[in-house]
């Protein structure tokens, strides 16, 4: 890359003004996120994938914007950093332990808090406050799964969480966000609508099948999976989720006619093979 133009958002401070609310179920969380689209620059919710019935998908919604501080006098102290000192057994994160954690996490969050100041890094990357957090998943690790679906397919989010709960596939981290339009790139992931990101411990026998079912659900709704996190998507789903895949293959054939540029993801999804034919 010889030259790149990057569009930046000008800010006058390193703080974010944050409002936090707890909601009893997924419907209430999503309704609040839609209602606040015009009032908040950033909106993210933690949702509880372990609950069923009337409290399915209960969540903690945090919304905010950059603090306007042209004088630069406001200083937000950095949060103290915790650390996971050892790698626990893989079985530690199971349905029972994650349900207990989710209950505590939900209760500790404020029911309604307005105007709290958060350090910008802590707001955007809360897991960075816990060093070696990945050790919590034990030696078997975890699988990341993230989808984006159009506004009109918001019910896919509820159906995905229902499947996870019904199949007893636990998610230690489930994050729901609103997306604006994607860019003009043929493989752009965002689309105006919703994105759900999950961290799932490796272990449950049903996990591969459930994720395949969620992939199908997303594809049928006109959505897509985030390839930067993917490690197991079936190749047949790629052109359904990324209908402009052909444009990428055409460009790759021009700039890399001998197929020198390769990756494990490209090999698994057949991108490399298609581009060299």
PLM features per residue range, with description:
Residues 1-277:
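Noncatalytic alpha-helical scaffold of FAD-dependent oxidoreductases
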